[in-house]
Amino acid sequence: MKLQLVAVGTKMPDWVQTGFTEYLRRFPKDMPFELIEIPAGKRGKNADIKRILDKEGEQMLAAAGKNRIVTLDIPGKPWDTPQLAAELERWKLDGRDVSLLIGGPEGLSPACKAAAEQSWSLSALTLPHPLVRVLVAESLYRAWSITTNHPYHRE
């Protein structure tokens, strides 16, 4: 199974790249993890936000293809680390690759939400999208470590 993080935005601060890459390199070869960045639409004073969201959504869904789609959204399910590890195991048994979608400043398009098989909430707080990339990578790595009895996670 391959994990994909499909995220709106292409110019992240160095600390995001450093943090994300640190966890990316830790993933085992039998569970590769990749980042697909979707260019954010231009948002200005007179921008048509619905059109921008729809276009970003189309690009995200195209990147996900036939993968299991899991959206990251505040109204999603809040999984603790053991629950995320259990989800990771279920995803592996399903046999499909998994695409986790992170929207832009206005969130995800209605099409992305409708296509999602699951929705995961990292927090009831609104988090900066660059930070979410690092949090998701670390959380998935920690969940993987539980499923393989790797010493990274300690009870």
UniProtKB/Swiss-Prot annotation:
Mutagenesis / variant outcome for changing residue 138 to A/Q: Loss of activity
Binding, S-adenosyl-L-methionine: 72, 103, 122-127
Keyword Methyltransferase listed: yes
GO molecular function terms listed in the Swiss-Prot or TrEMBL record: protein homodimerization activity; ribosome binding; rRNA (pseudouridine-N3-)-methyltransferase activity
Family: Belongs to the RNA methyltransferase RlmH family.
Quaternary structure and interacting proteins, as annotated: Homodimer.
Function: Specifically methylates the pseudouridine at position 1915 (m3Psi1915) in 23S rRNA. Specific for fully assembled 70S ribosomes.
Name of the protein described by the UniProt record: Ribosomal RNA large subunit methyltransferase H
